[in-house]
A protein has these predicted regions:
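A structural motif corresponding to the C-terminal end of an alpha-helix
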Residues: 1-8, 63-75, 143-146, 170, ...
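Core AdoMet radical
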Residues: 1-65, 74-78, 105-107
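Conserved aromatic-histidine-acidic binding/catalytic patches
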Residues: 10, 53, 82-86, 155, ...
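Active-site glycine- and acidic-residue-rich loops that bind
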Residues: 12-19, 83-92
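Short, conserved, surface-exposed binding loops centered on an aromatic residue
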Residues: 28, 66-70, 96-100
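Short, catalytically relevant binding-site loops at active-site mouths
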Residues: 43-44, 82-85, 112-115
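Alpha-helix N-cap and loop-to-helix initiation/capping positions
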Residues: 52-60, 86, 128, 162
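Auxiliary Fe-S-binding modules of radical SAM enzymes
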Residues: 89-203
């Protein structure tokens, strides 16, 4: 339906299966109506397997970036979620790998732990990286005003404080060094097809 009406589509995914629709996405991209972000938490395959067991491997996500780029689909990466004290040091390598794979833009988000996720994540840390658990939780509190989560608009995605600023500066420098521009994709509604009979055209 998006293709039929040339409706702009932006996709954020951790799954390489987005390439199954590469033919549709490339047709939409011809009208500036498509963009895809592959979200990558870490390049460490072992860590990724423990963090995101049901998601595509980092290598396969980069393969998806390459395939989408070669098909003419605007594609970028989200370094997300960045886990302070665990994955933030990977930002430069992650952005370089993404650029080498053909990513055209990049962004980031810091880990959020709303509701019951706080307890689940604490349990995960104690199970999988027990020697780093205390450090990671303290770093998260540093960027969340002493708490493990911050729901305030404008703060929840990037965090606040000295450590959040360090992450921001690291990302900004790494993005520049990798060759990314500061902007993201620009989608167009210039080619949107407005049906004369909306109900009839659905069937």
């Amino acid at each position: 339906m998006a293709l039929d009406f040339r409706n702009p589509v932006a996709i954020i995914t951790k799954n390489e299966l987005v390439t199954r629709d590469i033919d549709v996405l490339s047709q939409l991209a011809a009208f500036d109506c498509a963009a895809v972000y592959l979200s990558i938490t870490t390049l460490d395959a072992n860590l990724a397997r423990r963090l995101e067991p049901r998601a595509s491997t980092p290598e396969n996500r980069l393969h998806a970036v390459r395939a989408l780029n070669e098909a003419g689909v605007p594609v970028g990466v989200l370094a997300a979620p960045i886990i302070p004290g665990l994955t933030d040091h990977e930002i430069p390598a992650l952005l370089k790998a993404a650029k080498d794979a053909g990513a055209q833009f990049a962004g980031y988000q810091v880990l959020r732990l709303p509701h019951g996720l706080k307890d689940l994540f604490r349990e995960w840390l104690e199970t999988h990286v027990p020697t780093q658990a205390g450090k990671v939780l303290n770093r998260i509190r540093e960027v969340r005003g002493g708490e493990l989560n911050d729901t305030r608009f404008g703060a929840r995605m990037k965090g606040e404080g000295v450590y959040a600023e360090q992450i921001k500066q690291m990302f900004t420098l790494a993005r520049k060094q990798a060759g990314f521009s500061a902007g993201g994709p620009r989608l167009s509604i210039d080619h949107f097809r407005d049906p004369t009979d909306r109900q009839a055209t659905l069937f």
